[in-house]
Amino acid sequence: MKHDKEGAGYRHQRLEVSIAEELRSLLRDDVSDPDLDRVGVTAVALSSDYKNAKVHFVIARGRSRAAVERALERATAFLRRRLADSIELKRTPDLRFVFEAEIDMGPTE
């Protein structure tokens, strides 16, 4: 069977979007750590072998970047387990969080 590079690229891109959406949902609805309030996932860059994912994130202006990064580190195993339950992959990628920026976010709900 011929390997369809265009189809593989589409699948890769679709998985990046799916992982980003799932992480947004998990951070918003399932993670109870107050240090992760008002953290937004902006993009996911999945390695070509699907083993690693760089998760780009932003935080609300005034939040402690160091506290958020420590909280993300603590939550990584939980997030990977939940991703494994919701996204079909042979292996759930290792997550590496990459800070992008502090931004102004609207009031909390």
Where are these regions (language model features)?
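Charge-rich, low-complexity N-terminal segments
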Residues: M1-N52, V58-E109
